[in-house]
Amino acid sequence: MKLPQIINSLLETDMYKFSMGQTIFHRFTSYKTTWTFKCRNKDVHFTDEMVEEIKEQVQAFCQLRFTEEELEYLDNITWIKGTYVDFLRLWQPRYEEFTITTDAPCGLAIDAAGTWLNTTMYEIPVLAIVNEVYFRMAYDYDVLLKQFKRRLDEKVRLLEEDTYRLSDFSEFGLRRRLSAEAQEMAVKAIAEVELPADSHFIGTSNVYLAKKFNLKPVGTMAHEWIMCTGQGNHKHNPAYSNWYALDAWVKEYGILNGIALTDTITTDCFLRDFQLTYATLFSGVRHDSGDPYEWGDKMIAHYNSLGINPRTKTLLFSDSLDFERATALYDYFKDKAKVAFGIGTFISNDTDEEALNIVMKTTKCNGMDVAKISDVAGKGMCKNPDYVDYLNRCIDYRMKNDK
């Protein structure tokens, strides 16, 4: 490797990989998934040298194991069970499950295929590797880091001056961070700020940094959870994906770990399944696409229609936020519901250069295509347009006929 090792701990992933991973381990061990990388930036190109470095970094990641100290940390999290910790004691990433080539318009193609239990753990470290390799090799990294520090100092100053009202907010920037160094710098700096009354820094999705700085590791479920539990079983009608996902989650966690993601197959379809039982059991819902104000008003109206006081529930916003957008959302919703924010790239990769818009998504489960139909065009990723059409027709039929 030409660069220092980027991923140095198996805790260096997002918290929801463990919350989903435990449920996969207990309920879906036979499921197999395929994951596909995509760079959405049109003007980005990965050189052959970058691709080779990415391969070597992924190989280094695959040599890691959980330490006993890390396992003890996980075991002390309320909802993590000893059986899952014992599995993690034996678990290791498998480089054999990766295919990394230059066969893509951006110059980088990555696929991972294997059990869902394994491959779910690859997404976040791989994206962090790709991002850091790109910015270290395409730019003068020292210049970028100076820009990052300057902007971070300004954020800290404005936080201290009570410029923003961020309610309960967390850092969600691991997958698109400038570097491990930059993310750690940002999390540490924000954690040390004496925030005013309307802002509370809760923690980070990066479990490694949460452990290091004694912060709360934050995260529940991702789109893959709804896609695979709902669409990975060929006997399921995919328009009911949310029901299967919520049902399995509640069986695993009861009232714990309860922020539901709404936009995997549109929020309107989600609400058909998010009825009194689930709306009561889950502590809140997460917004990740579409107009956040329309979404929040829709969720509040839904809670009211069920006789649930929305002020007892959390609206967690996590779509392309910065501190100004979060403040505006807080001001609008603060008297209507609990409000929380997950803020990623703005904290972990804010420089003078455009951040990468990269994803690694589940494209198959158990040999069957899976897809996300979010609340805004352009966020979906499926290799088979016929399946997307089928899924849309299933959703449309349900919305028209399942009253």
Stretches with model-predicted labels:
Residues M1-S241, V359-K403:
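Ordered alpha/beta subdomains of enzyme catalytic regions
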